[in-house]
Design a protein with these regions (language model features):
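The feature marks the mature, well-folded catalytic cores of soluble enzymes
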Residues: 1-273
Length: 273
């Protein structure tokens, strides 16, 4: 909001009861609302804004909580988001994990601080905890190679994982995250959008004194074999919908491959599919 009114905004926020502060951090505040509620000094920022312009923008995507943090074995990654409109969501998420009474006595590792640097973004929809101390991550339009490297380092240093497999996805709005095209149904079964095809992948393991990470590139045709190896299996089962390409594409737009496994072989899906 600019240094000219930073102190006024902070003082206003600190004066609010808990519920109103939460509303401010999620719903934001306009110039007119702030002038009506706070003692604001001279500010170039204010002079250039219209009455209904936001000083603190609302966070309408905050409902998609699977993106801002990812529980990975015994730790939680507070993810640096890709789009500027969602960056503050991770700040709010961090405050919850660090200060909410529900987590005060919990024993878990906090990975990252939710504030990305440059292109280092990771969104939870691209993170799949497979088991066998392995993690599958989609290199999508929202999760960058830099972000995956940083996450892998944090996981290895904390002892939460031993292997990260990154799959190079198409950079397309229709396949925004890995979980829109591929999810697990049980320990060795995946449901996959037929149009996804086989993807180039990278196996990331802890490095040594000379290099922090060991990265191995895998050919697209080895995609399933690489994932099976990470799971400690000889092979994996892949299920796709028995439809023609047009019908499959239409169902994928409705997240047809987006399952939530609540137990091995027991999944929650969208009724529309």
């Amino acid at each position: 909001c600019g240094p000219g009114i930073e102190e006024a905004v902070r003082n206003y926020a600190e004066s609010l009861p808990d519920a109103e502060l939460a509303e401010l951090l999620i719903a934001g505040v306009t110039k007119a609302e702030l002038l009506d509620r706070a003692d604001v000094q001279e500010s170039l920022t204010l002079r250039t804004l219209g009455a209904d312009d936001c000083l603190l923008a609302p966070l309408p995507n905050h409902l998609f909580t699977r993106d801002t943090s990812s529980w990975i074995y015994g730790g939680v990654s507070i993810n640096p988001m890709c789009r500027p409109a969602r960056v503050r969501e991770s700040v709010n998420e961090e405050a919850i994990y660090l200060h909410h009474p529900r987590f005060a006595d919990a024993d878990f590792t906090v990975l990252g601080d939710g504030v990305g640097s440059g292109f280092a973004s990771v969104e939870g929809g691209d993170v799949l905890v497979m088991g066998n101390r392995s993690v599958l991550v989609g290199l999508s339009e929202r999760t960058s190679p830099q972000g995956v490297e940083r996450l892998a380092l944090q996981l290895f240093e904390a002892g939460e994982a031993e292997r990260v497999v990154a799959v190079e996805m198409p950079k397309a709005r229709a396949q925004m995250h890995l979980d829109t095209v591929m999810t697990m149904a049980d320990e060795g079964t995946f449901v996959k959008y037929a149009g996804l095809g086989m993807l180039r992948s990278y196996t990331i393991r802890p490095g040594d004194a000379k290099r922090p990470l060991h990265v191995e590139a895998n050919a697209p045709e080895r995609m399933h074999a690489v994932i099976a190896e990470a799971l400690g299996l000889d092979s994996m089962r892949v299920l796709t919908t028995p439809q023609d390409s047009l019908a499959a594409e239409r169902e994928q737009w409705n997240d047809g491959a987006n399952l939530l496994a609540v137990a091995p072989g027991a999944v929650v899906v969208y009724e529309r599919n």
